[in-house]
Amino acid sequence: DIVGGLPAKDFGREDEHLDILMSAAKENGKLVHVHVDQFNSDEERETEQLARKTIEHGMQGKVSAIHCISLAAHPKKYRHEVYDLIRQADMHIISCPTAWIDHNRTERLSVSHNSITPVDEMVPAGINVAFGTDNICDIYKPFSDADLWTELRVMLEACHYYDIENLV
């Protein structure tokens, strides 16, 4: 069993959302599983927020962040500051490469990046990264079949990260 969350659903009250999740998980001895930074935007900072709340609530090693896509939309210096926080929080990252690869195009101009968790930076930075799938044969991804080999292959090609020794 886990306690799951989606802070973006409580826009403007994300801290309260995370406080409730962490408190419920701590009281019940559960792990925490939170979907963060899904919109591929430099306006999102939920991964950082989750890492800080993990430390604040003493939940190190018990929290997984799913997606973390928007990290790629931030400057490298900020990303590495967040990686340091993730390590301090002993937080796990779950990348779901095909979940947002079709992110809608916008007219917003920014540094070039794709809508994939920056696994190619996280793994060498010493962050524990796993793969998952986020939508199985549903309205959003009708052809997704939960094949983790597909998820791995998409990440490999999208991030140009082929260091197999560090991926196993």
What is each PLM-predicted segment?
Residues 52-63, 99, 103, 114-168:
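His/Asp/Glu-enriched, well-ordered alpha-helical/loop segment
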Residues 1-64, 70-93, 109-131:
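Histidine/acidic residue-rich metal-binding segments in metalloenzymes
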Residues 67-69, 97-106:
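Short, basic, glycine/proline-bearing loop/turn elements
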